Design a protein with these regions (language model features):
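Short, residue-level hotspots on alpha-helical faces of the histone-fold
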Residues: 105-108, 134-138
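A short, flexible helix-boundary coil/loop motif
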Residues: 80-86, 114-117, 142-156
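Polybasic low-complexity intrinsically disordered regions
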Residues: 1-53, 57-61, 68, 72, ...
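Helix-centered, glycine/charged polyanion-binding patches within enzymatic domains
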Residues: 36-112, 120, 124
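C-terminal/domain-terminus segments
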Residues: 118, 123, 130-132
Length: 156
């Protein structure tokens, strides 16, 4: 399910949209997962401003260094330490970073079902078209999603 969306022009960088996207979410946020393009202090600060207990899962860049802030290590610093100690693949497994692939799958569904490009010409109309596409996709996903129940095997 897509819980927030925005359409910007090519002059807007993705990390600058973290705040506006989070503002669209009415429910408590427990976790934010994003790709490495979002790595950086501004993203972490924006997320922290929206709630204290939000877990941030963003892979640090390969050139990342720990922050020089005094006090306890930041979430990003803990990610860097874990990667240094156990490796990037172990970090991905421990943080469940692989869940991000579900987001990529959803975007693939959008492009396959709604279309790979917008049809409207004006920017405001394109924003409306994108929002309508998200609403349609969410309705389709909700309709077709099975209600799964985890069952434990019965001992013989």
């Amino acid at each position: 399910m897509i819980v927030a969306q925005t359409l910007t022009d090519q002059d807007v960088d993705d990390p600058s949209q973290v705040g506006p996207l989070i503002d669209q979410i009415d429910e408590p946020i427990g976790r934010v997962t994003a790709d490495g393009a979002y790595d950086g202090r501004p993203t972490y600060q924006t997320i922290a401003a929206h709630g204290d207990g939000i877990t941030v899962v963003i892979p640090p860049r390969s050139t990342a260094v720990p922050s020089s802030e005094p006090g306890s290590p930041t979430q990003r610093d803990r990610h860097l330490a874990m990667i240094a100690e156990q490796g990037r693949m172990a970090w991905q497994a421990a943080t469940e970073y692989g869940q991000r692939s579900l987001m990529e799958t959803t975007m693939g569904r959008y492009k396959a079902l709604i279309g790979p490009r917008l049809r409207a010409r004006g920017f405001a109309a394109q924003q409306t078209e994108a929002a309508m596409g998200v609403a349609v996709l969410n309705r389709m996903l909700a309709t077709g999603r099975p209600q799964s129940v985890h069952c434990l095997p019965v001992a013989a």
